[in-house]
Amino acid sequence: MARYLGPKAKLSRREGTDLFLKSARRSIADKAKFDSKPGQHGRTSGARTSDYGLQLREKQKVKRMYGVLEKQFRRYFEAAERLKGNTGANLLGLLECRLDNVVYRMGFGSTRAEARQLVSHKAITVNGQSVNIASYLVKAGDVVAVREKSKKQARIVEALQLAQQVGMPVWVEVNADKVEGTFKKVPDRDEFGADINESLIVELYSR
């Protein structure tokens, strides 16, 4: 499956929630009504969605939110199953450890897609070493930084300013002057309030 390159607002409307695919500088809420589906008239049928349909939709929503394709998403789920604890929470924890997501959480990119681009363009280092793999899993204590030659990019400066206004997640510690941050720990499930029902994904893959 190829990566989706179409309108981001359309995806959020399809899932009925903000997937955080667009910068908060231009809120997607201004362009899409999440309670209506894509199309001229949205969904007209009041038919009940099957359990399988709900499970599949939840998986699609999380994949789109984190920008992960099916094969890789399945690998994350299998890895989550091997870890101790709740499989659904483990799955989200692994997704939160992706380098592109950590760059986004630290405010260096205004969206995960923008953060992924910074990683692929070699603008990001981990513990002083350049890393250009978006799926690289960041560990507790790792220092993630923007390379010196990229620190003055307008999009990075603006994204960081916005993140400072909104507030940083508790599991990262960011030095805005150095444009670097420390990934303190894998976040607990209750620390990020994403509109996700991960148990539906576990049920889907357990069928």
From Swiss-Prot:
Q: Which GO terms describe its cellular component?
A: small ribosomal subunit
Task: Give me the ranges of the annotated region Disordered.
Answer: 31-53
For the keyword Metal-binding, the answer is no
Instruction: Tell me which InterPro entries the record gives.
Output: Ribosomal_uS4, Ribosomal_uS4_bac-type, Ribosomal_uS4_CS, Ribosomal_uS4_N, S4_RNA-bd, S4_RNA-bd_sf
Keywords assigned:
Ribonucleoprotein, Ribosomal protein, RNA-binding, rRNA-binding
- PROSITE patterns referenced in this protein's UniProt entry, alphabetically: RIBOSOMAL_S4, S4
Top-level taxon of the source organism = Bacteria
Q: Which GO terms describe its biological process?
A: ribosomal small subunit biogenesis; translation
**GO MF annotation list:** rRNA binding; structural constituent of ribosome
Domain S4 RNA-binding intervals: 97-157
A family per Pfam:
S4
- Please name the NCBIfam families in this protein's record: PRK05327.1, rpsD_bact
Q: Which family does it belong to?
A: Belongs to the universal ribosomal protein uS4 family.
Please give the subunit comment from the record.
Answer: Part of the 30S ribosomal subunit. Contacts protein S5. The interaction surface between S4 and S5 is involved in control of translational fidelity.
PANTHER family the record matches: 30S 40S RIBOSOMAL PROTEIN (PTHR11831), SMALL RIBOSOMAL SUBUNIT PROTEIN US4M (PTHR11831:SF4)
Q: What does this protein do?
A: One of the primary rRNA binding proteins, it binds directly to 16S rRNA where it nucleates assembly of the body of the 30S subunit. With S5 and S12 plays an important role in translational accuracy.
Q: What protein name does the entry list?
A: Small ribosomal subunit protein uS4
Q: Which gene encodes it?
A: rpsD
